[in-house]
Amino acid sequence: MMARWCVGWPAAARGGRDELTWQAELTAHAAGEFSMAAAQANAVMEDQAQVMASPGATLVGVYDGHGGPDASRFLRSRLFPLIHEFAAERGGAVDADVIRKAFLAADEEYLQLLRWSLPNMSRAAASGSCCLLGAISGDTLYVANAGDSRAVLGRRAAAGQTVAERLSTEHNVASEEVRRELAALHPDDGEVVVHARGAWRVKGIIQVARAIGDVYLKTPEFKRDPAVQRLCSAAAAVELARPVVTAEPSIHARKLKAGVDLFVVFASDGLWEHLSDEAAVQLVSKSSTRRGVAARLVQAALGEAARKREVRRGDLRRIERGVRRHFHDDITAVVVFLDLDDDGGRRARRRGRVVDSSSSSCSNTPLDVYSLYNSTA
């Protein structure tokens, strides 16, 4: 099964002397190479990411958790296997329908897991996760998103320069468009989005309108659980006529063009709150080597976070996990290079199964960066 391919992680390197950073410098995939990196800010890492490479396809997942690590860790273990299951029903081909079914099935599985496990998993009932998926199948790239992680393409423009093109749709209620959409879906609820603690929030609690998990915003049965109320006191006041958060992803498909579509940056919002789309694309395109490029993105974001708080980057390294969350969020970045040939993809003609158990490999970020380097933690 695919689940066993997605355990562990490739040989890691500390990001400088910072025990809260990690990277996998460069690894091959079906249509090129990829680089991964992460930086931990929370007491327990809430971001997760993974890349599965097989001869016929490449899958990229970035899962930005909130309210604890449970939902993002669940996605790390279940999303790729679900894609495999639904793709197998269609002869092995991945497409938008397969991806949508996998998102919704993952959300339902998480809900059922909690129903079976309460009160032992009450902490997990307060957890949710944004979910960003990239799937390269032949010469087509699918990008699916629920939440506010982001995928940005580095594309060669007519004049030869590399420009940024955003590929994902975000669902953060900081956007007036997202707030209007949510209000239209809930015309009888004047408090479906409120401004609380300095930001717009769904029911005054979370900032995203789409996510996996956050079950207390989808069904009233969990808000009544005493343990859930202890973990998320605001849940007790939530009145639900219907779910106010959904796992429905926004999905975009793109035919890849050789020599034009160069690379894609997949990252959690911890990166994007400090780097613009254009800044990230320029950093990647101007790097002298691909090796370690994701770590350079993460370091650039950390440098900007330090600058905003008027501290030196070296001082930021000495701030412990948990406390560091006051300076930046967990940050995860995956840079996927697209080495395409003239007919659309180095292996575009291989349109067999999405995955092959004999030749697939899966790379993950660590469950917890601090614990990776501190085995007694």
Curated annotation (Swiss-Prot):
Mn(2+) 2 binds at residues 64, 269, 329. Transmembrane segments: none annotated. It comes from the Eukaryota. The keyword Magnesium applies. Its cofactor is Mg(2+); Mn(2+). The keyword Manganese applies. Residues 30-338 form the PPM-type phosphatase domain. One of its GO terms (biological process) is regulation of intracellular signal transduction. Mn(2+) 1 binds at residues 64-65. GO terms for molecular function: metal ion binding; protein serine/threonine phosphatase activity. Pfam families: PP2C. Gene3D superfamilies: PPM-type phosphatase domain (3.60.40.10). InterPro entries: PP2C, PP2C_BS, PPM-type-like_dom_sf, PPM-type_phosphatase-like_dom. It catalyses: O-phospho-L-seryl-[protein] + H2O = L-seryl-[protein] + phosphate; O-phospho-L-threonyl-[protein] + H2O = L-threonyl-[protein] + phosphate. Its EC number is 3.1.3.16. Binds 2 magnesium or manganese ions per subunit. SUPFAM superfamilies: PP2C-like. Keywords: Hydrolase, Magnesium, Manganese, Metal-binding, Protein phosphatase. Belongs to the PP2C family. This is Probable protein phosphatase 2C 61. The lineage of its organism: Eukaryota, Viridiplantae, Streptophyta, Embryophyta, Tracheophyta.
